[in-house]
Swiss-Prot record:
Alphabetized HAMAP family for the sequence: MshB
Annotated EC: 3.5.1.103
Catalysis: reaction(s): 1D-myo-inositol 2-acetamido-2-deoxy-alpha-D-glucopyranoside + H2O = 1D-myo-inositol 2-amino-2-deoxy-alpha-D-glucopyranoside + acetate
Provenance organism: Nocardioides sp. (strain ATCC BAA-499 / JS614)
Function (record text): Catalyzes the deacetylation of 1D-myo-inositol 2-acetamido-2-deoxy-alpha-D-glucopyranoside (GlcNAc-Ins) in the mycothiol biosynthesis pathway.
Cofactor(s), names only, from the UniProt record: Zn(2+)
Protein name: 1D-myo-inositol 2-acetamido-2-deoxy-alpha-D-glucopyranoside deacetylase
Cofactor stoichiometry and binding remark: Binds 1 zinc ion per subunit.
Lineage of origin: Bacteria, Bacillati, Actinomycetota, Actinomycetes, Propionibacteriales
Gene Ontology MF annotations: N-acetylglucosaminylinositol deacetylase activity; zinc ion binding
Chain residues that bind Zn(2+): H13, D16, H155
Length: 302
């Protein structure tokens, strides 16, 4: 099936898509727009939150990636998304892992696997995505900002690969064997609204929840994944699709627990916590704006 409007999302690990843009994906899929997800790794180094599955860990049986493949399939079914690929095919790039810096953001781990995405050759990885771009021909691309939200090396690498691939895909003389050139009209970085985050934190604290997003003060400095409202470009109101997003998050059971911070946010703040998804425009012209000066559709102006 050929869709008139086509969205491509590039994410690092299974579950990133559901947390970041799950509601938008469900909304656009339900509206009959094309939604394609490219996941760069299998998430092999993720923390396992299900005790009976800890044997799948990288330092034991090393089968978490295959298990998370099934979780992602289930999540896509919940979102109504039928076009999902792994960059270069499943198993091409491995989750790089990470560690926490004393300043509170992620940095590369001390010991990184030789096939880790962080070590990937940029042009080779980009070429895998160029082929997808030229096949799908999306008008809109969504990925991370240059810091990967919170510094995870795979998020940063996904940003680099997506950005480079988008540029290469538009060059008619570049790798003609990968398909006809395609210039993506608009590129967005996923974002989180500062005012919304502060309001959500305040609601959590007033409800007596001091553990969800521990260490984050609604009136204090916030981590780098939070974006000042003045730097936001678009908001997609997909509150009608929050249940699909939450169901997709539940499908990633090894990574997200229903008693964790994400669901605490939903329980205390309601659908608005997860149904409004924000973006920063990195390439392209802005379309029609709402009263807050934001686009309400990623395809606005196209």
């Amino acid at each position: 099936m050929t869709f008139d409007q086509r969205l491509l999302l590039v994410h690092a690990h299974p579950d990133d898509e559901s947390i970041g843009q799950g509601a938008t994906m469900a909304k656009y899929a339900a509206e009959g727009r094309g939604v394609t997800l490219v996941t760069c790794t299998g998430g092999e180094m993720g923390e396992i939150l299900v005790p009976e599955l800890t044997h799948l860990a990288a330092d034991q049986e090393d089968r978490l990636g295959e298990h998370r493949r099934g979780e992602l399939d289930a999540a896509m079914a919940e979102l109504g998304v039928t076009d999902h690929r792994y960059l270069g095919g499943f198993g091409t790039y491995r989750d790089s892992g990470m560690k926490w810096h004393e300043d509170g953001h992620a940095v590369p781990a001390d010991d990184i696997h030789q096939n880790a995405f962080w070590h990937a050759d940029l042009t080779e990885a980009a070429d895998h995505l160029v082929a997808v771009i030229r096949e799908v021909r999306p008008q809109v691309l969504v990925t991370y900002d240059q810091f990967g939200g919170y510094g995870h090396p795979d998020h940063i690498q996904a940003h680099r690969v997506a950005t480079y691939a988008a540029a290469l895909a538009a060059v008619p003389s570049y790798r003609k064997d990968l398909g006809a050139a395609w210039d993506i009209a608009k590129i967005y970085w996923g974002a989180m609204s500062e005012s919304r985050m502060r309001a959500a934190l305040r609601a959590l604290r007033e409800a007596g929840d001091t553990t969800a997003f521990e260490g984050m003060d609604p009136d204090g400095p916030l981590p780098p994944f939070v974006t000042a409202d003045e730097d936001l470009s678009a908001v997609v109101d997909a509150q009608e699709h929050v249940e699909a997003k939450l169901a997709a998050m539940r499908a990633h059971a090894t990574q997200i627990t229903t008693d964790g911070p994400f669901f605490a946010l939903s329980n205390n703040v309601g659908n608005v916590a997860w149904g409004l998804e924000f973006f920063r425009l990195a390439k392209g012209e802005r379309g029609e704006l709402n009263q807050d000066g934001l686009e309400t559709d990623l395809f606005a102006g196209l």
